[in-house]
Amino acid sequence: MKRLKWGRLTILLVVILGICWFFFQGVQKSETNVDTQPLQVAELPKTGLSEKVVPPKYIPPEIDAKAAIIIDASNGEVIYQNNENEAVAPASMSKMMTAYLVLESIHNGKVHWEDPVKISAKSAQTEGAKIPMQANDTLTVKDLYHALMIESANNSAVALAEHVAKTEKNFVQLMNEKAKQLEMSDKAKFANASGLQEPDGSETKMTAADVAKLAYHLIKDYPEILEVTHLRQSQLAFNNVNVTSTNEMLNKNNKALYIEGIDGLKTGFTDSAGYCFTGTAKQGDNRVITVVMGTKSKTKRFTETNKLMSYAFQLLN
């Protein structure tokens, strides 16, 4: 009886030991699997954003103008452009071509700064911006040139045109010939020396790209132009007449408009052209030329120019 009891106990012990052995084998196998399995990293959710985020300084500003352009004055390369190939009226910005031909004539020795210019009836009667001079008055080329580029005097433009080419009509022919030589577009057509609308309704037309190219060549070929266009005021020898710049960006006290390095170049306005401005400024080794055409107010042409110049210098500097 005792042998039977001990036999049963022995069998029960063997069964328990077997169960324990299988249990520990399973645990060890499970631990081994955990240690050897590669780590699975969950993929991050997509954000929908581009991998490359454009820095704010590379985002061009919104410009409220019919047309606009920025070029690098060192090489003529375009930095920004909008509607730059539409031919529109440039108003007095066309006087940059008048100044170009005057400076060319001076460099060629055909005209001199102290040449006396007798004012014709046509010149004296020219409308719009003008200096106080009458028919038969005599002014020097230098005085007329300062009045042209600082105060945008239309009567000075006509007087200079007549002095260089005998008549304004002849001068306009020179303007259009020079436009071709400078490789301005076929859309560039000069109607007179001042930028005013003619009695028959015709007027000068240029694209913003044409205006920028003209300014580029004017500064490149005759950098002395900036010695005049950076002036806020100047006194003429003729009757001590004071001329005041139409470029309000030259005023350092006007924080909303002024930008460091501004030294030109030419404003423009007629009813058909709207308010226009070709500006240039230099910061460090970088000079830019900007053009805005067809803005809605006198101040707007300068605020939009400030935006363009700030953007350009952020890129270049």
Q: Where is each model-derived feature located?
A:
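Hydrophobic alpha-helical membrane-embedded or membrane-associated segments
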Residues: 12-16, 268
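Hydrophobic single-pass membrane-insertion segments
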Residues: 22-33, 313
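Penicillin-recognizing serine hydrolase domain
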Residues: 33-35, 53-56, 61-65, 167-317
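Hydrophobic membrane-targeting alpha-helices
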Residues: 9, 18-26, 105
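Active-site-adjacent loops and short helices of periplasmic peptidoglycan-processing enzymes
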Residues: 3, 30-209, 219
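N-terminal Sec-pathway targeting helices
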Residues: 1-13
